[in-house]
A protein has these predicted regions:
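Basic, nucleic-acid-binding surfaces and adjacent catalytic neighborhoods in DNA/RNA-processing proteins
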Residues: 1-132
Length: 132
């Protein structure tokens, strides 16, 4: 959950390899990690005080991208996307984190192959056709 939020705050793609980060991206990621974790620690302390949370969950309605698949990104309004791998899921904003490009997960992109949308605009156009 927090990794999705940290990467969104740092404006980094969830598939970017750490060995390819520039020095500036490393600093940005470090600050985003500190800021995001500090913010959530404070929020959770305010909610629970000295007690233990009633419900332990990774899905919180006020998160920017985690658990918000297909909902609008609070920063740019683009539809939050996800990558599913085995039992794990990563949520990201294609516009804020990936220059508007959609990332392919193993299951759906293999099924769709050539029909997999390349960017957010292509996906939105297809969704509009389905709705009509």
């Amino acid at each position: 959950a927090y990794s999705d939020e940290i990467l969104h705050c740092a404006r980094l793609s969830p598939v970017k390899q750490t060995k390819t980060l520039s020095e500036n991206e490393e600093r940005t990621l470090f600050r985003a990690t500190q800021n995001t974790l500090t913010m959530w620690i404070q929020r959770l302390r305010q909610e629970t005080g000295t007690g233990f949370p009633e419900k332990v969950t990774a899905f919180r309605k006020d998160m920017a991208v985690h658990g918000r698949y297909r909902l609008p990104c609070p920063e740019c309004g683009a539809s939050v996307q996800r990558i599913v791998y085995a039992q794990n899921e990563a949520n990201y904003c294609p516009r804020c984190q990936n220059d508007g490009k959609l990332l392919a997960d193993r299951s759906l992109s293999r099924l769709l192959k050539k029909n997999w949308p390349k960017n957010l605009e292509e996906l939105e156009m297809r969704n509009q056709r389905v709705v009509k």
